[in-house]
Amino acid sequence: MNSKYLFVFLILIVTFTDLCQGFLVGILPRMRGFITPFLKKVRGRRELGSQYDYLQDFRKRELDLDDLLSKFPDY
């Protein structure tokens, strides 16, 4: 009696996992195609932000260098 229920349970598990796998295989490419443009926009914003920080640091170092060079005597 127990083996009959175990067999039915295993059949249901196999069927359920097959359906889930088919669902995931079908939906994941669509989700990737939907999410990819948003990730590119976020990455582009992040790159612009990092370029802006880099330029600010570069200007600050340039001003510090000018200040340092102005303290040296002229020869």
Curated annotation (Swiss-Prot):
Note: Shows a low ability to inhibit hepatitis C virus (HCV) infection in Huh7.5.1 cells and no ability to inhibit hepatitis B virus in HepG2.2.15 cells.
UniProt tissue specificity: Expressed by the venom gland.
Family classification: Belongs to the non-disulfide-bridged peptide (NDBP) superfamily. Short antimicrobial peptide (group 4) family.
Name the UniProt record assigns to this protein: Peptide Ctri10033
Naturally occurring in which organism (per UniProt): Chaerilus tricostatus
Annotated propeptide span(s): 47-75
Residues bearing PTM Arginine amide: 43
Keyword Secreted: yes
Main location (coarse class): secreted
Signal peptide segment: 1-22
Entry superkingdom: Eukaryota
Record keywords: Amidation, Antimicrobial, Antiviral protein, Secreted, Signal
